[in-house]
């Protein structure tokens, strides 16, 4: 029997509050659902890059359709976009796992039949992934994941020097600490550095202590960056340490000759997890289901893992097997070999905490703290 992850009572009002922080941004790029009723178009709300031909061209050809993507950055923006869009505007949404309970509570995603998807092909740890199940019912299927820790310039810092988040406060790091401008992973890392496990379920005293520690980093900061700016700042050396990001950025840079790596510090790291859901109100439920099946098939999983500019870990053992058979060098680089050390080791060693939304504070409280930090 599957069990749901305890999320508490979350109302539609809570859902709307989560999207307020990005409301203005969403308004400047409002989605126009011109293709909502076109049976040959799958409308897809997702993080950037997930409608790249490398990922979706095969699906489009097999089904005689085109995928139209509306891109967002950060779950708060995703919530704002989907809330402000007429029903039927989107058929599928790729969401971070920590936002699934808000999508479910607001009745924006369909219940899924587990038998429709290859969950038995997944690593056992991910077959009943708690953030995707509510009252024993499935609402999202994991597509990929990765770890967030401390990314660093390998010419300037040794692995020993960055074995703890304490490296962020070192004299050597002054003016060299870059921040991904999203409160959740950045503050989650600082919470871990303060010994909070789990890092997002903390009382007011621990929250205030975490804020104080965060604010003490301002003299160390080189800047607050978008995704594109993170890539460039690590490449040009302006940022030499960045908490709360991971190999989804540093692996691609390293393969292009940039001296960067990511470590999970002794205080632990975070796991980001992406999943696909069917948006309630879609007239193309069957096509949406086929797209999730395609993405979680061994072939779809290998493509998710090996996209040139955004390499990821995948939950499907069948995908791992196909990757090792067809692209063994990539499997080794991605630490997804079936023998020897691999990316599941950190998970099994309990070094990883799920990235989640704040439990004991409002999302706005964390966002406000982040804004205050940036304005110091």
Q: Locations of the language-model features?
A:
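Oxyanion-binding "anion nests"
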Residues: 229-249
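Extracytoplasmic ligand-binding site segments that recognize negatively charged/polar headgroups
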Residues: 75, 94-235
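Periplasmic-binding protein-like
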Residues: 207-216, 246, 254-280
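N-terminal secretory signal peptides
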Residues: 1-14, 18-22
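Mature extracytoplasmic/periplasmic domains
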Residues: 279-348
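Conserved C-terminal helix/tail region of periplasmic/extracytoplasmic solute-binding proteins
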Residues: 232, 342-376
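Early extracytoplasmic/lumenal segment of secretory-pathway proteins
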Residues: 37-102
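Paired acidic/hydrophobic, glycine-rich loop segments that form the ligand-binding mouth/hinge
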Residues: 91-94, 223, 240-245
């Amino acid at each position: 029997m599957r069990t749901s992850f305890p999320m508490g009572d979350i109302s539609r009002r809570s859902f709307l509050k989560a999207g307020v922080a990005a409301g203005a941004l969403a308004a400047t790029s409002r989605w126009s659902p011109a293709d909502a009723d076109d049976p040959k178009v799958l409308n897809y709300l997702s993080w950037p890059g997930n409608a790249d031909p490398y990922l979706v061209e095969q699906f489009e050809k097999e089904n005689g359709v085109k995928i139209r993507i509306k891109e967002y950055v950060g779950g708060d923006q995703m919530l704002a976009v989907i809330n402000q869009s007429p029903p039927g505007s989107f058929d599928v949404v790729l969401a971070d796992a920590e936002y699934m309970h808000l999508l479910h509570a607001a009745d924006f995603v369909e219940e899924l039949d587990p038998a429709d998807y290859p969950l038995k092909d997944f690593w056992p740890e991910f077959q009943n992934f708690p953030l995707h199940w509510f009252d024993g019912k499935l609402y999202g299927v994991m597509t990929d994941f990765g770890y967030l820790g401390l990314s660093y310039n390998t010419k300037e810092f040794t692995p020993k020097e960055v074995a703890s988040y304490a490296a962020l406060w070192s004299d050597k790091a002054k003016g060299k600490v870059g921040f991904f401008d999203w409160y959740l992973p950045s503050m989650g890392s600082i919470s871990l550095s303060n010994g909070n496990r789990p890092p997002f379920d903390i009382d007011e005293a621990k929250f205030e202590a975490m804020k104080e520690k965060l604010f003490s980093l301002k003299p160390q900061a080189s800047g607050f960056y978008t995704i594109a700016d993170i890539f460039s700042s690590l490449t040009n050396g302006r940022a030499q340490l960045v908490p709360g990001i991971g190999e989804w950025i540093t692996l691609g840079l390293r393969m292009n000759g940039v001296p960067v790596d990511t470590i999970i510090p002794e205080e632990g790291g975070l796991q980001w997890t992406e999943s696909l859901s069917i948006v309630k109100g879609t007239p193309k439920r069957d096509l949406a289901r086929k797209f999730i099946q395609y993405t979680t098939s061994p072939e779809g999983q290998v493509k998710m893992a090996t996209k040139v500019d955004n390499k990821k870990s995948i939950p499907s053992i069948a995908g791992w097997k196909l990757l090792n058979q067809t692209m063994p060098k990539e499997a080794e680089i991605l630490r997804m070999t079936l023998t020897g050390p691999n990316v599941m080791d950190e998970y099994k060693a309990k070094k990883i905490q799920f990235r989640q939304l704040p439990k004991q504070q409002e999302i706005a409280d964390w966002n406000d703290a982040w804004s205050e930090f940036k304005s110091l």
